[in-house]
């Protein structure tokens, strides 16, 4: 996390839980990194599984036209945790559930693009090198922020976990 990013406290009403996140991080990212479990699937605003009610505070929704949020939800001050970012301290209402707690907590990793290969007319494979081991479980994916691309996008890892810091994606 960059030092110049504003930090905000997010309180989960009724659960006695809170966490601190950057205003550039999503509510879902903060929830998962804090070890709290909530239902979520797409992590991109399409499914609506991570819906919460904003009780106090201000958030920015990165995907206003999200299929996961109806106009009736918006009138009830509902937002999607995966595409909303805090702009102040917030109080939210969501139902934590231990069955959804992450086995590994998401973390930010900086890496350098090492190679790109076109596999088919619409499939590319690319590898990054980081200073940290590439530890992940089957089925996990990474949200990558790439220069020139609006917003992060989810990519599946295509290599095996390793201690060399090599991350492959398709």
Give each language-model segment a name.
Residues 30-39, 49-98:
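Iron-sulfur (Fe-S) cluster-binding segments and ferredoxin-like electron-carrier domains
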Residues 105-170:
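Ferredoxin-reductase
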Residues 1-39:
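N-terminal pre-ligand scaffold of iron-sulfur
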Residues 11-14, 54, 146-148:
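Short acidic, glycine-rich loop/turn motifs
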Residues 97-105:
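Intrinsically disordered, low-complexity Ser/Thr-rich linker and spacer segments
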Residues 15-18, 88, 132, 149-151:
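Short acidic/polar mixed-charge low-complexity motifs
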């Amino acid at each position: 996390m960059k030092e110049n990013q504003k930090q905000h406290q997010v309180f989960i009403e009724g659960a006695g839980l809170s966490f601190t996140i950057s205003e550039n991080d999503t509510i879902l990212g903060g929830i998962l990194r804090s070890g709290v479990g909530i239902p979520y699937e797409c992590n991109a605003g399409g499914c609506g599984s991570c819906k919460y009610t904003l009780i106090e505070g201000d958030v920015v929704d990165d995907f206003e036209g999200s299929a996961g949020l109806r106009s009736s939800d918006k009138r009830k001050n509902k937002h999607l945790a995966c595409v909303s970012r805090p702009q102040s301290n917030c109080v939210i209402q969501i139902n934590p559930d231990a069955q959804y707690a992450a086995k590994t907590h998401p973390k930010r990793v900086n890496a350098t693009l090492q190679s790109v290969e076109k596999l088919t007319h619409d499939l590319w494979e690319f590898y990054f090198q980081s200073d940290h081991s590439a530890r992940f479980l089957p089925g996990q994916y990474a949200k990558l922020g790439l220069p020139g691309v609006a917003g992060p996008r989810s990519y599946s890892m295509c290599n095996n976990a390793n201690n060399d810091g090599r991350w492959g994606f398709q």
